[in-house]
Amino acid sequence: MFSEELKAFRRLGIRHLLLQALNFASVIASGLMMWKGLGVITNTESPIVVVLSGSMEPAFYRGDLLFLTNPSGVRFHTGDITVYKVPNGDIPIVHRVLETHEIAPNATFVPHKYNRAYTPEDQLLLTKGDNNPIDDTGLYTQGMDWLERKHIVGKVRGFVPYVGYATIAMNDFPQLKYGLLGILGLMALIQRE
């Protein structure tokens, strides 16, 4: 089945193999640069995330691909769908803002006014999954009742349904991920262009 490919692989010189490996590395590096560039444009460490659970049904289903932004200086409102990571949490969580609260440590006086102007960083959020019966305080770190702005990864701006199932499959079955990477690497090495 792969006899022709193996013969072609043996006929290639070391110089050609190194060139193909360099081309493969440049494709990987280009992908990483695009990911980081998208992160800079959207002001978030993860501009694209996959929904991993059914906690946001019927708004989003497991496997939906979400596009995020996190503009600084913009306040969150009740009903906004956010993605957040709690301290010592590995997986970002996609849930809706249930309630907002203001704190005043960074507040400044507005001239000729008796009230304070709050910055978006002074905002605290309480979230809940649409399909969950209670709010997320049980998911937060112990002693944490509200999310701070530093915990927010981004606000959902759009989605593509079910495209993220490929990512879920590769995480659930690591052999699939390594097999696909191996096939891609082999194809890059034996490609004759």
UniProtKB/Swiss-Prot annotation:
Location of the protein in the cell: Endoplasmic reticulum membrane
Source superkingdom: Eukaryota
Gene Ontology process terms (BP): signal peptide processing
Cytoplasmic side: 1-16
Chemical reaction(s) catalysed: Cleavage of hydrophobic, N-terminal signal or leader sequences from secreted and periplasmic proteins
Enzyme class: hydrolase
Residues annotated as the enzyme's active site: 55, 95, 136
Record: glycosylation sites: 106
EC number: 3.4.21.89
Stored PROSITE patterns: SPASE_I_1, SPASE_I_3
Keywords, alphabetical: Endoplasmic reticulum, Glycoprotein, Hydrolase, Membrane, Protease, Signal-anchor, Transmembrane, Transmembrane helix
Matching InterPro entries: LexA/Signal_pep-like_sf, Pept_S26A_signal_pept_1_Ser-AS, Peptidase_S26, Peptidase_S26B
C-terminal short (CTS) helix: region residues: 179-190
Topological domain ranges for the Lumenal compartment: 42-193
Lipid bilayer topology: Single-pass type II membrane protein
Transmembrane parts of this sequence: 17-41
Main subcellular location of this protein, as a coarse class: endoplasmic reticulum
Example of a GO cellular component annotation carried by this entry: signal peptidase complex
Record GO terms (molecular function): serine-type endopeptidase activity
Free-text note regarding domains: The C-terminal short (CTS) helix is essential for catalytic activity. It may be accommodated as a transmembrane helix in the thinned membrane environment of the complex, similarly to the signal peptide in the complex substrates.
Alphabetical list of PANTHER family matching this protein: SIGNAL PEPTIDASE COMPLEX CATALYTIC SUBUNIT SEC11
Record family assignment: Belongs to the peptidase S26B family.
Main function: Catalytic component of the signal peptidase complex (SPC) which catalyzes the cleavage of N-terminal signal sequences from nascent proteins as they are translocated into the lumen of the endoplasmic reticulum. Specifically cleaves N-terminal signal peptides that contain a hydrophobic alpha-helix (h-region) shorter than 18-20 amino acids.
Known partners and oligomeric status: Component of the signal peptidase complex (SPC) composed of a catalytic subunit SEC11 and three accessory subunits SPC1, SPC2 and SPC3. The complex induces a local thinning of the ER membrane which is used to measure the length of the signal peptide (SP) h-region of protein substrates. This ensures the selectivity of the complex towards h-regions shorter than 18-20 amino acids. SPC associates with the translocon complex.
Entry protein name: Signal peptidase complex catalytic subunit SEC11
